[in-house]
C-alpha cells in the first residue's frame, strides 16, 4: 500500500505547545476573527420573548421553532464531541488548536443558548424534557444519534 503524504497540520511537533512565533498567519487570522465575535448567553435579552412566543406566533410556528431548537441543542453536543475528541487530539498546529479551542467555547455558548431558549419558552416540564432529549425522543434527531454512534464505531477501528 502506498504511503500517505505527510499532513503538516497532523504532524506532531514541539512547536504546538507555544503559540508564537506564528507560523500559519491565515489560520491565526481566523482565530482572531472568531475571538472578536465572542458573546455570552447572558448578553441576549429574552425579557420580551415570552410575550411574543405566546401572542405573536401560531401553534405551527411554535412547533417548528421548538423542534429546530431541540435539534440544535442536541446537535451541538455532537459537534462538541467531535471538536474535543477528534480535532483537538489530531491537529498539531498551535494556531489551529487555538481556533478549535475557541470554537469549542463558542459551541458551548450556542448549546447554552438553545437550551436557555427552550427553558424560557416551554413551560411544561414533560415537554421540555422531551425536547432536551431530542436525540433520543424525536425521530429526525434520532438519525443524528445513529450517525454519531456509527462515527464512534468507525473511530475505534482506526
Swiss-Prot record:
GO terms for molecular function: oxidoreductase activity. Gene3D superfamilies: Ribonucleotide Reductase, subunit A. CDD domains: RNRR2. Transmembrane segments: none annotated. PROSITE patterns: RIBORED_SMALL. SUPFAM superfamilies: Ferritin-like (SSF47240). GO terms for biological process: deoxyribonucleotide biosynthetic process. It comes from the Eukaryota. Belongs to the ribonucleoside diphosphate reductase small chain family. This is Putative ribonucleoside-diphosphate reductase small chain B. It comes from Arabidopsis thaliana. The gene is RNR2B.
Amino acid at each position: 500500500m502506498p504511503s500517505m503524504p505527510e499532513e503538516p497540520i497532523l504532524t506532531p511537533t514541539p512547536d504546538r505547545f507555544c503559540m508564537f512565533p506564528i507560523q500559519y498567519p491565515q489560520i491565526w487570522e481566523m482565530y482572531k476573527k472568531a475571538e472578536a465575535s465572542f458573546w455570552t448567553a447572558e448578553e441576549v435579552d429574552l425579557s420580551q420573548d415570552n410575550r411574543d412566543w405566546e401572542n405573536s406566533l401560531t401553534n405551527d410556528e411554535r412547533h417548528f421553532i421548538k423542534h429546530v431548537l431541540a435539534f440544535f441543542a442536541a446537535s451541538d453536543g455532537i459537534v462538541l464531541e467531535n471538536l474535543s475528541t477528534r480535532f483537538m487530539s489530531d491537529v498539531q498546529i498551535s494556531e489551529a488548536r487555538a481556533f478549535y479551542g475557541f470554537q469549542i467555547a463558542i459551541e458551548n455558548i450556542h448549546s447554552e443558548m438553545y437550551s436557555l431558549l427552550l427553558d424560557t419558552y416551554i413551560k411544561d416540564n414533560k415537554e421540555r424534557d422531551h425536547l432536551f432529549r431530542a436525540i433520543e425522543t424525536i425521530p429526525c434527531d434520532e438519525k443524528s444519534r445513529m450517525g454519531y454512534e456509527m462515527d464512534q464505531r468507525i473511530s475505534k477501528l482506526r
